[in-house]
UniProtKB/Swiss-Prot annotation:
Catalytic activity: a quinone + NADH + 5 H(+)(in) = a quinol + NAD(+) + 4 H(+)(out)
Localization annotation: Cell inner membrane
Stated name of the protein: NADH-quinone oxidoreductase subunit D
Keyword Cell inner membrane: yes
Organism for this UniProt entry: Jannaschia sp. (strain CCS1)
Keyword Translocase: yes
The enzyme's E.C. designation: 7.1.1.-
HAMAP family cross-referenced by the UniProt entry: NDH1_NuoD (MF_01358)
Physiological role: NDH-1 shuttles electrons from NADH, via FMN and iron-sulfur (Fe-S) centers, to quinones in the respiratory chain. The immediate electron acceptor for the enzyme in this species is believed to be ubiquinone. Couples the redox reaction to proton translocation (for every two electrons transferred, four hydrogen ions are translocated across the cytoplasmic membrane), and thus conserves the redox energy in a proton gradient.
Lineage of producing organism: Bacteria, Pseudomonadati, Pseudomonadota, Alphaproteobacteria, Rhodobacterales
InterPro entries listed in its UniProt record: NADH_Q_OxRdtase_suD, NADH_UbQ_OxRdtase_49kDa_CS, NDH1_su_D/H, NiFe-Hase_large
PROSITE patterns according to UniProt: COMPLEX1_49K
Subunit: NDH-1 is composed of 14 different subunits. Subunits NuoB, C, D, E, F, and G constitute the peripheral sector of the complex.
Membrane topology annotation: Peripheral membrane protein
Amino acid sequence: MMDGDIRVNTYDDGSTDFQTGEQKIRNFNLNFGPQHPAAHGVLRLVLELDGEICERCDPHIGLLHRGTEKLMESRTYLQNLPYFDRLDYVGTMNQEHAWCLAIERMTGTDVPRRAQLIRVLYCEIGRILNHLLNVTTQALDVGALTPPLWGFEEREKLMIFYERASGARLHAAYFRPGGVHQDLPPELIEDIDTWAHEFPQMLDDIDGLLSENRIFKQRNVDIGVVTEEDIQNWGFSGVMVRGSGFAWDLRRAQPYECYDEFEFQIPVGKNGDCYDRYLCRMAEMRESTKIIHQACEKLRNEPGEIMSRGKMSPPSRGDMKTSMEALIHHFKLYTEGFHVPEGEIYACVEAPKGEFGVFLVADGTNKPYRAKLRAPGFAHLQAMDYLCKGHQLADVSAVLGSLDIVFGEVDR
């Protein structure tokens, strides 16, 4: 009993409510998703609301779980590569990159310079693909209809660059342990460079629509603030870290491939809110465009091999027609696959959403003993309850949009 006529009732599930005379006050539970258009895939949030205020946010995951890590244990290293396109299916080649890096470090393979440049070029195209989708759909989540239409127009052009390099628009499977599948024709490099000259104009258009838009700022400023302590507690990475003022980027902090040769800035925010994360992504697209220019220039001037020659790469067609050993090598490579020496390694890349890592345990056979995938979106989604507490129901979709979550990598 409480003082006066206010009594507390306790229920079997441990929840309580207050009874004031005849009236009961109990928090309202609401399902957000998995069919909700702002849920970015198959996310289900169980929200506990006190009026309009979100008291608790419980993410339910697993609706896109396919057991990728277990499936990888029964496939050869090369057969596992396409699984990585299906994790974060918005900016695909960055995930392939992490897998190839892990295998190359385990086997001590040196990637030819031209292949490194092609990888950097296509990883940055993937970064722009990702940020274009995120920035424009974040705008859609808070009520702006035009940016997604403009963003998808540019994404279509980038998808065609993917298709011209690999034959596929989305699931490219273009990287290989030891290099890339095939060389880029000179016309493609020219077309990418031309596109990169025109793209900043489109960014200026989106900038003009959103950055100083009163409604967009009201919906995003001071929403979902992330502090230095939160970053360490929740394991944030990528834009979630840089939006709070910390210039942590694996391309600079732990350079891989030939990123240390490129000139680019690391955009950082100041307040760590949804709006600063949006500004970081906009600035990152401009920096990626600079890297694309530099990569195209280097590719024009540096012809060469695109695969390291050895047991991990297929022989040329010409060799296979004249050499029995080359034919046997080709057959064994695509049936049994190459063997990776025993050991374990962690390889990570600065994917568009944050640090995407692969912890690979090899037992000396042609299949991985265990591969653990470290998806950035998984760590970010964990913090939904923490970030949404005390905000209004309408702010939940703004926070979700700024986390940049794709369910392929969260559920795996």
